[in-house]
Amino acid sequence: MNAAIPNQAAKFLAATAHVDEAAVQPLPNSRKIYVEGSTPDIRVPMREIRQADTPLMFSGEAGTGAERSEPNPPIFVYDCSGPYTDPAAKIDIREGLPALRTKWIEARGDTEVLRDLSSEYGRQQAANPELATMRFPGLHRHPRRAKAGMNVTQMHYARQGIITPEMEFIAIRENNNRAAYLESLRASGPQGAKLAALMSRQHPGQNFGANLQGEITPEFVRDEVARGRAIIPNNINHPESEPMIIGRNFLVKINANIGNSALGSSIQEEVEKMTWAIRWGGDTVMDLSTGKNIHETREWIIRNSPVPIGTVPIYQALEKVDGKAEELTWEMFRDTLVEQAEQGVDYFTIHAGVLLRYVPMTANRMTGIVSRGGSIMAKWCLAHHKESFLYTHFEEICEIMKAYDVAFSLGDGLRPGSIYDANDEAQLSELRTLGELTQVAWKHDVQVMIEGPGHVPMQLIKENMDIQLESCSEAPFYTLGPLTTDIAPGYDHITSGIGAAMIGWYGTAMLCYVTPKEHLGLPDKDDVKEGIITYKLAAHAADLAKGHPGAQIRDNALSKARFEFRWDDQFNLGLDPDKAKSFHDETLPKESAKVAHFCSMCGPHFCSMKITQDVREFAAKEGLNEADALARGMEVKAVEFVKQGAEVYRKV
């Protein structure tokens, strides 16, 4: 097998590669902060959003003087953007990000640095002079692998009772600095205790058996990983990544898919999609490239990514045999796994549950097999009339995974591609097989999550979640949507966002975004952002519905800002400050409108919140509570009505 010689090298030159300037700007009125752990090298990033003070007229405090106001301390939100939004960081994508986990990995003493790449294909690519102009220039280290007989997975450490720095990092990150925020409220003034109670109020949730914690501790993280209910996707060859966790007892996460195709995109564009995706909240990114220079594209993405990177290795393996599925071999696939593991891929989607006997079950479907990986393996099974090498060599795959700490994302190759096919025999048979394979992986202390559908109408979503929890022993579920209807091409980020919010509530740990281009074309940067924002909404709505501790703080802060006409704070506390501000400024562009007590929806005389504030002012002036003030106000208006002739309509 010869390494591919690119025919598009001139389109991307490593020497002129540059960061997307839009991705490195701090979000409005926000700054990057770092919360330190038990050692100085555990520095957990968060985004601090500063707010304006509440004017006296809204604060509820007695007293006079324009200087009196109620402070609104900054709130803290989960931040996936890595150093890109930190003005103090020096970003050069030709050098990649700092390897922040290297010392932790070295300190464990169970890995070794290899003299050369283990993959035949990787060595061919490294030696190919035609690739010199596009090759990532900043990697000055050799890959690592577990020492002989060692297991380097976070699950293995967890089962040995070891709390790793990654686990402590995650515990701090999941708590979102909530304790510090509430303390800042209590210390903010005479109304501090009342304000803390107001901002921390949250509706009780329905968590469907999830084990949510008031405070996440490193020990809780360790226990969940040991049980297999959560995974930490952190390949030892991706030390640039910031530790994160995927599990239903933690915040719901989202994934963004990027990747080139045979019809378009370049390395520069894919790196820009990655940095754009994490800016808006992508917790992980999957590189699904199927076009030219897959190896080189992936290297650039991994070296510049602070979030875990996932792939579907069978895509690249298929490119190596010119798209002929029947020519795939275990040896070629194994080499691809090692190649990608030594680059630093954090999780592999592997469609090992597509069994030969399940393929005929799809014959009467409306849309057949829609998974690319699933269709590749189904074709291979039929061509050779035997079970796929992914299934028969699964234990050997586990040996590779635990040597680099790559997590499984067991692929749903028979997922439904239409609501007509939802929850059918093929889909659920494969799901149960994935549960069996999970037990095999856990025997090797290899981390596992399970991929899910797909297209499922709302009334069938909970059944899907319940079957997964039972069949897969609560291994994290990772779903594409699901799309709840098939009638809206161009709007499938919405059709799927509905299903994503529901299945996230029922227990899915990570939601794979869908962009408006789904089923229609390759998404660009704008589509990536649209998909991310939609899925951040779905994940947050799921956290609220589950009753995840502290989930409502941001909602409360934005609602308070809205009621107090703090327009800039409304924009900045939202998921997309830029769009919120642009919509407002379309009709009220002047700076004075940022302090106006109305917007263009109702105008100055019909703003419900302004009317409510008028009632409160009237109540305070008359010494009444709000209910009595409304009654007194109605009496006054009634007298006016009679004096004016008791006519429903008056000439003016």
Curated annotation (Swiss-Prot):
One BP term from GO: thiamine diphosphate biosynthetic process
MF annotations from Gene Ontology: 4 iron, 4 sulfur cluster binding; carbon-carbon lyase activity; zinc ion binding
Disulphides: none
GO cellular component annotations of the record: cytosol
InterPro entries documented for this protein: ThiC, ThiC-associated_dom, ThiC/Bza_core_dom, ThiC/BzaA/B
Keywords annotated in UniProt: 4Fe-4S, Iron, Iron-sulfur, Lyase, Metal-binding, S-adenosyl-L-methionine, Thiamine biosynthesis, Zinc
Cofactor note: Binds 1 [4Fe-4S] cluster per subunit. The cluster is coordinated with 3 cysteines and an exchangeable S-adenosyl-L-methionine.
Reaction equations catalysed: 5-amino-1-(5-phospho-beta-D-ribosyl)imidazole + S-adenosyl-L-methionine = 4-amino-2-methyl-5-(phosphooxymethyl)pyrimidine + CO + 5'-deoxyadenosine + formate + L-methionine + 3 H(+)
Pathway stated in the Swiss-Prot or TrEMBL entry: Cofactor biosynthesis; thiamine diphosphate biosynthesis
Cofactor(s) needed by this chain: [4Fe-4S] cluster
Binding residue positions for Zn(2+): H455, H519
EC number: 4.1.99.17
Gene3D superfamilies cross-referenced by the UniProt entry: 6.10.250.620, Radical SAM ThiC family, central domain
Annotated residues for binding of [4Fe-4S] cluster: C599, C602, C607
Pfam families documented for this protein: ThiC-associated, ThiC_Rad_SAM
Record keyword Transcription regulation present: no
UniProt: substrate binding residues: N257, M286, Y315, H351, S371, R372, G373, D412, G413, L414, R415, E451, Y478
Similarity field: Belongs to the ThiC family.
Record NCBIfam families: PRK09284.1, PRK13352.1, thiC
Protein function: Catalyzes the synthesis of the hydroxymethylpyrimidine phosphate (HMP-P) moiety of thiamine from aminoimidazole ribotide (AIR) in a radical S-adenosyl-L-methionine (SAM)-dependent reaction.
Subunit structure: Homodimer.
Full protein name: Phosphomethylpyrimidine synthase
Biological classification of the source: Bacteria, Pseudomonadati, Pseudomonadota, Betaproteobacteria, Nitrosomonadales
Encoding gene (name): thiC
